[in-house]
Amino acid sequence: MVNISIIGAGSVAFSMSFIRDLCVTESLWGSKVTLMDISKDRLNMIHNLTVRYMKETKANLKIETTTNRKDALDDAEFVLCTVKVGGYQPMETEREIAERHGYYRGIGDRVCDYYGGFGAYHQLKFFLELARDMEDLCPDAWLIETANPVFEGTTLISRETKIKTIGVCHGHFGYKKMAKTLGLSLKDVNVEVAGFNHCVWMTHFLYKGRDAYPLLDEWIEEKAEKYWKSEEFLKGLPWETEQMSPAAVDMYKQFGLFPIGDTVRSASPWWYHTDLETKKRWFGPTGGFDSEIGWSIYLKYRESRLKRMQSIYSDPSASLTKEFPPVMSGEQHIPIIDSIANDKEKILQLNIPNKNSISGIPDDVVVEIPAVVSGRGVQGIHVGTLPKRLMLYVMIPRMMRMEQILQAFKEGDRKSLILALMEDPRTKSYEQARSLVDELLAQPWNAEAARHYR
């Protein structure tokens, strides 16, 4: 029986995965779950759906709601954060502005990082405020961070506060798509995935206890071209086809380990992304998740999902367990809580400070690695050395971009934002970078950021 707070619970589809997992985890029944969101409408929706789901599954949980973050944190033992400050529309406008300045599909992770907003300012500020509130109201609680940018955010929190912080993502499950494409039975597949959030690589791949990288090599040599002409690849959703795309295979050839999940798009070389036709060659007919085609498909998918949630919310007779079958969702948040609260040892894929797990990465940089979770806490598993080329051309540059973002944020340094953008191969002059930074910071939703970055 524990106190769990979900900050940003109005993200209904995501929050329902937490509720679903809580309702089927009987060892956590009796827990208090506080749903917090600044939107009363969304809060009412998730509360309604939660109560109905509990009734259908006969789960025993105490549910409270609030629009006040500090009330939600009072005496919490586990805090789940899913907040995206300001929503997604400002980011779409920022992308359009960047394109006018010569940056096709926006400036990516070189300044704003993965869905962080420009300079990640609003997200990082919120993360730090949340952690400071936790130091006052629930200093012994665990913060389970899901909101992006996870890499920058968890590194910042772990350095600047005393809060126990875990970053969680589901991108590493991309290995399942790989195994399925290779025709392997998942129950006989064992992988180790390591790196940074959205930049993870398959360091070990076993099938029935034997090294399975040769099976991947064989597929690439004999079957990849046929697969890329198949209906499964050509007509699949962009976020489902990336894992076994030409981009993924080429990254493996370039850097020595196979990229997993979001890595295929967010850590891939710039020359895969110069224009739509180039993206199509590497990612398939849509150009991948981040192209104008792929992103439009995703936004329509999100909209249809929200409409579906609203329809179920408006229909008291609709079955929640039909929409969300009462089995574990696959997300790791509730298993983390169950492991720590009830001392059930599990190995999970988490973002935690390195502490010598990956060689060549400082101890205070958060890495995404397998970790042992139990009542004793969280202990990362030693990964060791990554290929030198991967370290030099991907890992260290990505780590330095994280450091640039955090330095600019902590010091309010506008010039650092410009200098970070100067490293983008699309930047032709200092004036181009400076004018883009100035225009982005001039947007009304960035007024506070403009004052911060002097």
Residue ranges and their predicted role:
Residues 12, 41, 173:
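Conserved Rossmann-like nucleotide-cofactor binding loop
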Residues 2-29:
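N-terminal Rossmann-like dinucleotide-binding module
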Residues 27-51:
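NAD(P)-binding Rossmann-fold cofactor-contacting core
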Residues 75-83:
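Hydrophobic or amphipathic alpha-helical targeting/insertion segments
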